[in-house]
């Protein structure tokens, strides 16, 4: 799809700051609080650049559970996940802000059931638009929402406009019902940019065992150091 032309998984061949923004300590703590657990995993993180006229970015309202789980959202929010959208540029209404509908409003019109019964229900889309809110904001704005929250992308109309953002999705560790990215599948990407700069807590979000875990033996420590020669493993010894 054209609108996903500039949509790329981490890690990138660039600064450690951009590579690690998705596991910023504040986001990790936010996710832990929202999911009511001390153990979270990052299962999606992508940079997304949009430019005026490059594609039709206008979307219908949808929920992310469709490609984040093979089942449906749970009433227990701890069994779902939390998604962050981080703006790196100022985003006005002319720069394609995400629009969303509060869960209370969508529930009042049987949002989830109607969506599952008929995803192309135009009347449902019209009703959702009556309640839509804008996530427009200056650079640094953070939008947090769950996989059961209706939202949609909007078009950029500012001449020469652009929008730089990142998505970051967390789930409770061990929740196999939620997924998106298998990080090892992207083994050819520059993971050294993450391993050489991340804390053990940040690496744990990718599934790397914490220091003291039984996984770490003299053998695994030695082999891991060979794989990432510049990784400071002193905390794991």
Task: Go through the PLM ranges and name each one.
Residues 1-73:
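Non-heme Fe(II)-dependent double-stranded beta-helix
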Residues 46, 63-65, 82, 86-90, ...:
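Short, structured patches in soluble enzyme cores that scaffold and shape functional sites
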Residues 54-61, 70-73, 94-103, 109-113, ...:
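A short secondary-structure junction signal
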Residues 78, 91-152:
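Double-stranded beta-helix
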């Amino acid at each position: 799809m054209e609108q996903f032309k500039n949509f790329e998984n981490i890690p990138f061949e660039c600064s450690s700051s951009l590579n690690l923004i998705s596991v910023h300590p504040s986001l990790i703590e936010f996710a832990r609080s929202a999911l009511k657990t001390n153990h979270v995993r990052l299962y999606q993180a992508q940079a997304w650049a949009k430019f005026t006229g490059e594609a039709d970015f206008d979307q219908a309202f949808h929920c992310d559970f469709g490609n984040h789980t093979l089942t449906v959202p749970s009433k227990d929010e701890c069994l779902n996940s939390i998604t962050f959208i981080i703006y790196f540029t100022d985003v006005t209404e002319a720069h394609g802000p995400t629009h969303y509908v509060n869960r209370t409003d969508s529930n009042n019109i049987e949002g989830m059931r109607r969506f599952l019964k008929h995803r192309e229900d135009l009347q449902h889309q019209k009703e959702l638009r009556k309640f839509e809110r804008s996530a427009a904001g200056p650079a640094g704005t953070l939008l947090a929402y769950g996989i059961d929250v209706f939202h949609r992308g909007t078009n950029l109309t500012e001449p020469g406009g652009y929008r730089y953002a990142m998505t970051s999705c967390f789930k409770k560790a061990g929740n196999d019902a939620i997924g998106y990215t298998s990080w090892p599948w992207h083994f050819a990407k520059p993971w050294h940019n993450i391993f050489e700069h991340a804390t053990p807590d940040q690496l744990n979000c990718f599934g790397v065992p914490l220091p003291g875990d039984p996984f770490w033996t003299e053998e695994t420590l030695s082999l891991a150091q060979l794989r990432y020669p510049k990784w400071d493993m002193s905390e794991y010894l």
